[in-house]
C-alpha cells in the first residue's frame, strides 16, 4: 500500500471509530473486577462490548474494544471466527480520565475471518481516540506474554507492541484484491495485515496470506523471519523494512518483496530501508529491491 493509502487507511479507521463505535454504548462490558475463568466480550460493530479489568481468559464474539482503562488477561485472549477486537485506544473513553491498555499473559489467538487491531503510536498508526489524527500525539503499547497466532484471519493490524513468543499468521486475508471487506468495509479501507514497531521474542512466520497489502516494519526479532507463499494485490507489497533480525530472513514464493518504501503516491521513487540480519538472507530477500522501474536487485543486501 503506498504511503498515501496507508495514511488514508489510518485516518478512516480513526474517523469511523470516533463517529460510530466510540459513540455507541456497550452490549457486554467485561468489567473492572477480577474475574476467574473465561470472560466473553461481545457486541456489534455499532454497539461493541468493552473489555476492562482483570480476567482469567477472554473470548471475543462479535465486536469488542479496549477503551475503558487497563485490561489484563492472565490466560489466552481468543478472537472467535468473524469477530473483531479493537485495542488501539490510548485513553479511558468511558470515564474521560486516565488511559487504556492491554496486557495478555498467555497467547492472543485470532480465528478464521476475524480481525485484530492492536496498538498505536504517532508515527505509524494514530490511536483510534486521538483527538487530532492528522497530528497525533497519543500511544498505546499492548503486550502479549506468549504467542500472537492467527489462522485464516481477515486482517492483523498491530503497532507499538511486544510479543514474548512467536508471531504466526497462516492464510486468510480476504483474497488477492483491494476491495474493502468485513470490518475494513466500515472504514473504507482495503484489507491488509501489518506488524510495525514491535519486539518479538521468537520467530515471525507469515504464510499463504492472500490480501491487498502487507508490512513487516521496524521489528526487533530474537529469532528468524519467514515469509512464504504470500500473494498480495498491491505491487507495493510485501514491505519488509528496517527490521533487526537476530536469526535468518527467509522469503520464498511471495508475489513480491521490498526493502524500500514508496515516497509518494506511486511505486517509484523509493526510499531504501534495509534490514539488519544476524545470520543469513535467503530466497527473495537476499539483495536489495530495485530503486527504479525495471531496475535490477542489489548490489546491497536486502
Where are the model-predicted features located?
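Leucine-rich solenoid repeat scaffolds
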Residues: 237-302
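Short aromatic-glycine motifs in intrinsically disordered, low-complexity regions
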Residues: 63-68, 90-99, 131-137, 154-157, ...
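Secretory targeting and sorting signals
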Residues: 1-33
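Feature marks extracellular polysaccharide-active and adherence modules
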Residues: 61, 67-69, 74, 80, ...
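N-terminal segments that cap or nucleate solenoid repeat domains
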Residues: 33-82, 301-302
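Acidic/polar low-complexity surface segments
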Residues: 84-99, 115-143, 168-195, 256-260, ...
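Extracellular secreted precursors and ectodomains with disulfide-bonded cysteine-rich loops/domains
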Residues: 39-43, 62, 118, 125, ...
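Repeat-based scaffolding regions
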Residues: 113, 153, 181-190, 197-199, ...
Amino acid at each position: 500500500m503506498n504511503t498515501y493509502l496507508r495514511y488514508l487507511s489510518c485516518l478512516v479507521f480513526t474517523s469511523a471509530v470516533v463517529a460510530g463505535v466510540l459513540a455507541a454504548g456497550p452490549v457486554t462490558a467485561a468489567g473492572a473486577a477480577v474475574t476467574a475463568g473465561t470472560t466473553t466480550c461481545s457486541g456489534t460493530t455499532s454497539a461493541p462490548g468493552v473489555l476492562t479489568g482483570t480476567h482469567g481468559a477472554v473470548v471475543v464474539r462479535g465486536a469488542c474494544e479496549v477503551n475503558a482503562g487497563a485490561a489484563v488477561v492472565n490466560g489466552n485472549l481468543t478472537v472467535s471466527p468473524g469477530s473483531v477486537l479493537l485495542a488501539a485506544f490510548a485513553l479511558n473513553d468511558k470515564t474521560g480520565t486516565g488511559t487504556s491498555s492491554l496486557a495478555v499473559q498467555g497467547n492472543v489467538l485470532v480465528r478464521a475471518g476475524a480481525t485484530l487491531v492492536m496498538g498505536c503510536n504517532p508515527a505509524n498508526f494514530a490511536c483510534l481516540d486521538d483527538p487530532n489524527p492528522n497530528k497525533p500525539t497519543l500511544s498505546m503499547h499492548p503486550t502479549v506474554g506468549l504467542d500472537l497466532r492467527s489462522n485464516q484471519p481477515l486482517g492483523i493490524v498491530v503497532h507499538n507492541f511486544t510479543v514474548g513468543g512467536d508471531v504466526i499468521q497462516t492464510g486468510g486475508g480476504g483474497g488477492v484484491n483491494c476491495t474493502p471487506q468485513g470490518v475494513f468495509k466500515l472504514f473504507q479501507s482495503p484489507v491488509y495485515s501489518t506488524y510495525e514497531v514491535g519486539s518479538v521474542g521468537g520467530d515471525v512466520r507469515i504464510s499463504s496470506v492472500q490480501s491487498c497489502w502487507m508490512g513487516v516494519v521496524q521489528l526487533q526479532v530474537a529469532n528468524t523471519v519467514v515469509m512464504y507463499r504470500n500473494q498480495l494485490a498491491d505491487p507495493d507489497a510485501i514491505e519488509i523494512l528496517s527490521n533487526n533480525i537476530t536469526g535468518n530472513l527467509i522469503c520464498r514464493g511471495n508475489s513480491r518483496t521490498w526493502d524500500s518504501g514508496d515516497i509518494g503516491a506511486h511505486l517509484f521513487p523509493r526510499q531504501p530501508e534495509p534490514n539488519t540480519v544476524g545470520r543469513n538472507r535467503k530466497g527473495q530477500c537476499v539483495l536489495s529491491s530495485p530503486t527504479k522501474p525495471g531496475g535490477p536487485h542489489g548490489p546491497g543486501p536486502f
